[in-house]
């Protein structure tokens, strides 16, 4: 039985700003780009969230919801330093750390003997140490599998934690909304709802085969998650699956020619990123992404063994066919990377009985 902890810092970027600039405390603040430059909110504090401000929201719209919102440009170098401090705390308890971003990570503490092996007590200790070292609060979810640990970390925010023991899983997943499962977005959830599938209990009444016929490989994953099954282990060295570049435009654009003028810089920057971070990796697809003035987006991709500038422009033309009169506010290009693993299989470790407190 694994013991997985998902640690998620509470409104991380905004919390760092409030820590370093106490005059911001108690006021609605957001870290993000300027509204006059079509910036986007990266994160915001809880005071701002009361007004409906959310991550990935246009700064201009956020200011309409909350006229007193204080926009902070952000200090990525500081956030990275604090993230490194947090990582050092994790490393005192386990080497099995899978960072998801600067402010969240999975930890496998199955073999940790501290605090009598209790995952609950270990999570409490980690959160306490993070606060002592950084002055910031963190929330945590504890469960035997990754996806439930991630869901649990959101159930007692901010500055809290939630435990899902093995015995709790059957009842917990029964009422769990499918949209809460990581990987199930709004579009997929809407498709599932048209089939009468809203909760995990609804999926449990289906066969794996019927779901796979409808959704392919994801159908099988969904079936497993609805039973509370997630065989994925912790990946301390997560393999990068793609490299991309995108830009939010100063003004909406509408034509292929206008997009054409933006593409060379994007492709050049993408080429540089591939050279720096994925030079030894083979690519397997190219992707063009457009976000429209209604904030809906579309992506077009095609298999490719090497980067082709012409293919990017061909994909751009296809993506523009979906514009339907809307303005384009964001344009992006990316490549998918082949896995570095060769002949990778499923390795299962069988652990002997441990005299510990479990969860």
From Swiss-Prot:
InterPro entries: DNA/RNA_pol_sf (IPR043502), DNA_pol_Y-fam_lit_finger_sf (IPR036775), DNA_pol_Y-fam_little_finger (IPR017961), DNA_polymerase-Y (IPR050116), DNApol_IV (IPR022880), IMS_HHH_1 (IPR053848), Rev_trsase/Diguanyl_cyclase (IPR043128), UmuC (IPR001126)
Cofactor: Mg(2+)
Active site: 104
Residue numbers binding Mg(2+): 8, 103
Cofactor binding description: Binds 2 magnesium ions per subunit.
EC number: 2.7.7.7
Any one cellular-component term (Gene Ontology): cytosol
Site location (Substrate discrimination): 13
Catalytic activity entry: DNA(n) + a 2'-deoxyribonucleoside 5'-triphosphate = DNA(n+1) + diphosphate
Disulfide bonds: none
UniProt-listed HAMAP family: DNApol_IV (MF_01113)
Function of the protein: Poorly processive, error-prone DNA polymerase involved in untargeted mutagenesis. Copies undamaged DNA at stalled replication forks, which arise in vivo from mismatched or misaligned primer ends. These misaligned primers can be extended by PolIV. Exhibits no 3'-5' exonuclease (proofreading) activity. May be involved in translesional synthesis, in conjunction with the beta clamp from PolIII.
Subunit structure: Monomer.
Family: Belongs to the DNA polymerase type-Y family.
Name of the protein: DNA polymerase IV
């Amino acid at each position: 039985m694994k013991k997985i902890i998902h640690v998620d810092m509470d409104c991380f970027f905004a919390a760092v700003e409030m820590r370093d600039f106490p005059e911001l405390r108690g006021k609605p603040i957001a870290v993000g780009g300027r509204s006059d430059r079509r910036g986007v909110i990266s994160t915001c504090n809880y005071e701002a969230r009361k007004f409906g401000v959310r991550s990935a929201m246009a700064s201009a719209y956020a200011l309409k919801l909350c006229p007193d919102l204080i926009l902070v440009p952000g200090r990525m170098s500081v956030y990275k330093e604090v993230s490194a401090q947090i990582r050092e705390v994790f490393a005192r308890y386990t080497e099995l750390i899978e960072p998801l971003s600067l402010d969240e990570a999975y930890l496998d503490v199955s073999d940790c003997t501290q605090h009598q092996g209790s995952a609950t007590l270990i999570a409490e200790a980690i959160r306490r140490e993070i606060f002592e070292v950084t002055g910031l609060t963190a929330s945590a979810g504890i469960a035997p599998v990754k996806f439930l640990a991630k869901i649990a970390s959101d159930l007692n925010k901010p500055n809290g934690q939630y435990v899902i023991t093995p015995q709790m899983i059957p009842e917990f997943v029964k009422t769990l909304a499918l949209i809460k499962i990581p990987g199930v977005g709004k579009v997929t959830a809407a498709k599932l709802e048209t089939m009468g599938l809203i909760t995990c209990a609804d999926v449990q009444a289906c066969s794996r085969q019927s779901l796979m016929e409808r959704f392919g490989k994801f159908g099988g994953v969904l079936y497993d998650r609805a039973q509370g099954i997630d065989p994925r282990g912790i990946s301390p060295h997560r393999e990068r699956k793609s490299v991309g570049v995108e830009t939010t435009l100063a003004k909406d654009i509408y034509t292929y020619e206008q997009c054409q003028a933006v593409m060379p810089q994007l492709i050049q920057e993408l080429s540089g990123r591939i050279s720096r971070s994925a030079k030894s990796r083979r690519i397997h697809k190219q992707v063009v992404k457009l976000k429209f003035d209604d904030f809906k987006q579309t992506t077009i991709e095609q298999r490719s063994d090497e980067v082709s500038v012409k293919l990017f422009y061909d994909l751009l033309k296809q993506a523009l066919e979906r514009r339907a009169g809307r303005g384009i506010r964001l344009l992006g290009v990316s490549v998918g990377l082949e896995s570095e693993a060769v002949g990778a299989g499923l390795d299962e470790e069988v652990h002997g009985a441990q005299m510990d407190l479990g969860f």
